[in-house]
């Protein structure tokens, strides 16, 4: 955490004996693109979005910029799945790189899942062992013990 960062805490007295939910931005904060946020509670992590951004002019030879996966590498055993909000590049563009390294289920709407399939095929990501689940309005999905 940089010296300018602030740690925010909200304490509701009726939840005094519970552990906090950690919100870990992995990209997309203070920038356009690379949207990716991890939510951790006890021994479970879920991720919302896994996007990319386009390189700046001073980055010759770079095709895309992806979020920093370091926190997930250190805590991969807690990872329960990824929720994709929609199929724009800044929300799904880093999935081929992420899913090569981490095998976890991916959940999203019909259009998002179809775009993800095309993206994974385009980037030659092996589909075997990957679980891509289409969700519809009203679906309830459980992740681990916490979510």
PLM regions: where:
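Beta-sheet entry/capping signal
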Residues: 18-20, 45, 103-106, 131, ...
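N-terminal Rossmann-fold NAD(P) dinucleotide-binding loop
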Residues: 91
